[in-house]
Amino acid sequence: MNLQGKNVTLHDMSLRDGMHAKRHQISLEQMIAVATGLDAAGMPLIEITHGDGLGGRSINYGFPAHSDEEYLRAVIPRLKQAKVSALLLPGIGTVDHLKMALDCGVSTIRVATHCTEADVSEQHIGMSRKLGADTVGFLMMAHMISAEKVLEQARLMESYGANCIYCTDSAGYMLPDEVSEKIGLLRAELNPATEIGFHGHHNMGMAIANSLAAIEAGASRIDGSVAGLGAGAGNTPLEVFVAVCKRMGVETGIDLYKIMDVAEDIVVPMMDQPIRVDRDALTLGYAGVYSSFLLFAQRAEKKYGVPARDILVELGRRGTVGGQEDMIEDLALDMSRARQNQKVSA
């Protein structure tokens, strides 16, 4: 693999995807410390919202320590060069949330849908572009469909006004060949002016390899998170990825030592538990399950006595997708009752 001379824009997820790992309980002080540290290290883009995007505050997804607006207004005025993005899932976030984010100073709106449901993004992508934002179409759980189907959905988002399309490995399921195929087809068939991005999870330990494959295939934006702070086994650990890019001659514009220090001195002490490929996170990747389901399944294990691993495998078998968190408790209860009935009949 020869990536010498390529340029890539890195996008930090630790203050959005990392919200899942923190049960959305990141304080304003922590948010500011991480964001300003990343800014000083040269990170060009930082995502800040509830883990499930703008408007995610709910019983289903979790109540954050502060509102999206409070986080955005606390952080954005303190940044010197980094720009801030906000994730928006139609059906959770609204056009009013989008306008609020832009009013706070957000420059990039990333409109996320399940990989087969790009059509629900038309209103939000169109409004974002009309209001002058850098507008990204974000196709989640992209491992579930073929490269041709990803392209079909990407073309819809592009037609609505997205200037960047993301192939998103929400489950950490993909291997490099699949990433290469999907990113390569997007790069070959979309408008040359449309940027291509990749968002990986480390559930199978493949996030760095997959991100490199994405760059080789034509991606110019890569998501990750400092210290890997994110759902499941986390996102592509950016301090590691920056080091790999430096060795391979890929220009990121990031100061390696500074981002290492943000990871070690600020983010790791914030963690409620180590972000690693444990058996439950590995099961997410192996079964192709949405990464933010991990803590929900672990809580259900404690409540109903059904191993999280078994719950996750069944969720994968049923083809559950992001937004179906409410099914996890129902499934765990059903599995618990079924096991009790088996014991009685035995």
From Swiss-Prot:
It catalyses: (S)-4-hydroxy-2-oxopentanoate = acetaldehyde + pyruvate. The keyword Methyltransferase does not apply. Coiled coil: none annotated. Keywords: Aromatic hydrocarbons catabolism, Lyase, Manganese, Metal-binding. The record marks R16 as: Transition state stabilizer. HAMAP family: HOA. This is 4-hydroxy-2-oxovalerate aldolase. The gene is nahM.
